[in-house]
From Swiss-Prot:
The keyword Metal-binding applies. Metallothioneins have a high content of cysteine residues that bind various heavy metals. This is Metallothionein-like protein type 3. Keywords: Metal-binding, Metal-thiolate cluster. The keyword Metal-binding applies. Belongs to the metallothionein superfamily. Type 15 family.
Amino acid sequence: MSDKCGNCDCADSSQCVKKGNSIDIVETDKSYIEDVVMGVPAAESGGKCKCGTSCPCVNCTCD
C-alpha cells in the first residue's frame, strides 16, 4: 500500500505524510518546508496522516 494513504489514493506516494517518515522525496526547499510543517501534526495524531497539497485527501488514516 505504498501508493495509498489509508482509504485515499494518492497520485504521488511521496506526498503521503506518515508518522515517523514525513519526507520521502524533496523536490524544492519550499516543498521541504511544507512537508515538515504537515508532518508534525500528522505524527501527533497517533498514526493519522494527510496527503500533501498534490493529493485530494486530507484526513487519511495510515496503516
